[in-house]
Amino acid sequence: MFHLIPFVVAFLLVFLTWFLIKKLRKVIIFELDQNSKHFGGELVADVLKAHDVRFLFTLCGGHISPILVAAERQNIRVIDVRHEASAVFAADAVSRLSGTVGVAAVTAGPGLTNTVTAVKNAQMAESPIVLLAGAAAGLLRGRGSLQDIDQLSLFRPLCKWSGRVNCVKDIVPMLCKAFYLARSGTPGPVLVEFPIDTLYPYSLVRQHLRISDNPQSWRQRFTNWYLRFYLFRLFANGFRIQPCLPGQVPTQIPVEIPSIPWPSTKSIDQLVWLLSQAKRPVIVVSSQALLPPVPATQTAEHVKSLRIPVYLTGMARGLLGRHHPCVFRHARRAALRVADLIILAGSVCDFRMDYGRVLNRKAKIVIINRDKKQLYLNSDIFWRPYLAIRGDVGTALKELSISLNDRFPCLSDFRCPTEWVGELLAREHHRDEEIRQSSLTQPAERINPLSVLWQLEHNGLTDQESIIVADGGDFVGSAAYILRPRGPLSWLDPGPFGTLGVGGGFALGAKLCRPQAHVWVVYGDGSAGYSLAEWDTMARHKAPAIGVIGNDACWSQIARDQLGLFGSNVACGLQSTRYDLVGAAYAGADPLNSTLSVEDSGAFLVTEKNLDNLSDYMAHARELSDRGLPSIINCNIAASGFREGSISL
């Protein structure tokens, strides 16, 4: 037995040597320039530049200062907001309108936790976002450092992927991976955490580690050795890819093409056949149809070429313009209950489709979606797809259009039966007239909310470039019946999460993407309270929006049903606050200054006494926007029963 001991010891020594070499080989062969002035924030900025990031939304913090400074040097426009949630909302808007990845950077701890709602909203809206978060230094993680929490565990359920940069050399590959994953498959948010010492220069980090130049004891010597080893591992080979000079294009950064599921030719051929046999077809197009790689304008043409009734939801509102004959907005439930072919192009059977209960069970139901889970959501309960196509929705619509018009010449003259279209048109015109008549009646006090929205539709949104941002409950829900987005990507709403507070951030991102457009934020008075502070951001960065607030001094969407069900409106009341003055003050104006008219400061109050001025106020607000000034039109509206019973449970 004892004769085996030398062999066991030798084996253990060999194993230990192999283990140490495996663990340390990357450090051993790496080099470190202790005199380098470069810092990790420069590498972050280079990756952003390589991925065509034009805007970086942030609220400053010491953990992320190197990123912000380096981004500015790379001519990336750094937009500092008043709340971290608005930074993510703005990045979300940029990703939706530009087809690129939106990027936000926030500091550690509360800076990051303030974004939770906005990140979850982006996840459910399928918006590709890269969120850069500061963090405590690696040495101090879990030791009570300032703003140190387990950020990755908190955000893992909210993101497609979350990762931590542990050393400078990992910055470029990890960020490139983040951009790739954000756009691949079903898009969504990703989080990259940067410990503070990965972003600052070597000399500064070494200084803060307080390495002793003359250790007096074995403990100090060991501590010095450990700190030097940590420092070496942190920076070794970190700048093998040299940071670019300001304005220089980073050519060494790899940019991967995202992986996107494509619809099969067989499934498209099946859909063509189903469409050719249908007598009462209808297509419901939603946000996923507007994702890259197919441009939204091309998707619009493909949908038009189908020549069948279309309902547009989410970001797809406005896809076919304001008055296309195939677009219907009202009585969708009635249409879906009698249609014999229902194509859900990016739409899913969640609460917006009453979980599938509104679909005709005898109809052939075709659903197209990138996400396998969304394809079959609630299909085991209320509905069942006849054909489920997993793939990019825009590509599927493109292939369907080509197949219907080119690959199958016998179907090129396909037309939807006129009786079916006539039935839908009759319902559409009837409902439009009902709404118009409802907008004409004025209460004794305050204003009919429908008349405000009617004027906004006909006197406010006067140009094709207008963008509508929807942020609210009851007033915004009414707006969806009246306002007609002017073209593709001209409507922004939170999506299925139903988030309040998106208005300021969405408007900021929209105006930066489309500086020539007038951006209108349709606010409820409750939701306006979340993001009016961003009027300060808009003024500072010359990215103005026009806010139209339906102010009924109430959380009306909740109060209406709560009062009816329980006889109490507790916690639903608000004040008739002068939000117009609040917005003007945030924008840097002094609305109480006697030398300046209230309207010239961007503050417009509309009551029953001056309702006739609303059209002029809207024109004045557009003029202010053209001069780079944001404004608020605060409309004191009356309670309305227009959307009674609309609460979703």
Curated annotation (Swiss-Prot):
Subcellular location: Endoplasmic reticulum membrane
Gene Ontology CC entries for this record: acetolactate synthase complex; endoplasmic reticulum membrane
Record Pfam families: TPP_enzyme_C, TPP_enzyme_M, TPP_enzyme_N
UniProt signal peptide: none
Cofactor(s) of this protein: Mg(2+); thiamine diphosphate
InterPro entries: DHS-like_NAD/FAD-binding_dom (IPR029035), THDP-binding (IPR029061), Thiamin_PyroP_enz_cen_dom (IPR012000), Thiamin_PyroP_enz_TPP-bd_dom (IPR012001), TPP-bd_CS (IPR000399), TPP_enz (IPR045229), TPP_enzyme_TPP-bd (IPR011766)
Function of the protein: Endoplasmic reticulum 2-OH acyl-CoA lyase involved in the cleavage (C1 removal) reaction in the fatty acid alpha-oxydation in a thiamine pyrophosphate (TPP)-dependent manner. Involved in the phytosphingosine degradation pathway.
This protein's name: 2-hydroxyacyl-CoA lyase 2
Organism (species): Xenopus laevis
Phylogenetic placement of the source organism: Eukaryota, Metazoa, Chordata, Craniata, Vertebrata
